Amino acid sequence: MTKSVIRTAVFPVAGRGTRFLPATKASPKEMLPVVDKPLIQYAVEEALMAGARRLVFVTGASKRAIEDHFDSDAELEKLLESQGKSELAAQVRSVLPKYATCIYIRQPAPLGLGHAVLCAQPAVGDEPFMVHLADDLIDAGVPCLKQMAAVYHQKGGSVLGVEEVPPSETDKYGIVETRGASTKISRIHGIVEKPKPAVAPSNLAVVGRYVLTPRIFSHLEKIGQGAGGEIQLTDGIARLMREQAVYAYRFEGKRFDCGSKLGYLQATVEYALNHSTLGGPFRNYLLDLMAAGQAPTASTGAASSPAAAPRPRRKRKA
């Protein structure tokens, strides 16, 4: 198999984000901020650092804010410069580097992740490509997709980012089956979408990162609706495995499930602790709360238990 340069990243962003209502009623869930950047910007930055230059967003209704975010805003930049806020103006300009191109494709119906990836085919063409699910925020020294691109170039086949999950949670993920000793890179021999714990082939879950060969498109075109009445990417990958090797890669880094409210809050706290300017004051705030033996009380009157002591982490740039 010819190992081409991976120039394209696909971002399926058509989902409605109902778990975050009413916050996502008029704003895309991918625009939810983690400290001072939206989830989709973290996703794009990871793809760019992995070598992507063409960014394909598969969108749906109420997603215009994503397009606006990555568009230039000369008026805002001019205003910031006139107010002496040159650093902020530079941050606005750097949201999307000039070498990157954005393509927006509308998913006509909510038919699942496999269908969303298939919608990107005209923009991807006959090249390998990355798929990034912005819900899964991964904090890593080397960006997760960059790690996976290296595995693709080493092995020459599609690569799925995986991690072990509690056996009781296999019905939330696509689960892979590998054979032999547990290693960082393993050939996949089976994959199933959201199996019940009693029948799951393992607890090794696919978590929002893919490097795929273009052959996946021909298989997605042939499959019907699977679990949940959707066209499942896992079903397409299962067919792809009949003709090409597909690999599971246990990535280095910590994943936050920002598709859940708890995971989103955990990401916000840890990224805030690691922020170059906010980290110190925020850490002191949490320590003061713990010293007082209480956590802040929400407006509903419900109080949470004292926070666990935050662990030191590498500093993140502002």
What are these regions (language model features)?
Residues 2-82, 143-147:
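N-terminal glycine-rich phosphate-binding loop and ensuing alpha1 helix
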Residues 76-79, 86-178, 212-214, 221-223:
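Conserved beta-loop-beta/alpha segment of the NTase-like Rossmann-fold superfamily
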Residues 130, 149-153, 180-284:
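Catalytic-core segments of class I nucleotidyltransferases/pyrophosphorylases
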Residues 15, 61, 136, 143, ...:
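Alpha-helix/helix-capping structural signal
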Residues 8, 53-55, 101, 128, ...:
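Residues at the starts of beta-strands that form the adenosine-phosphate
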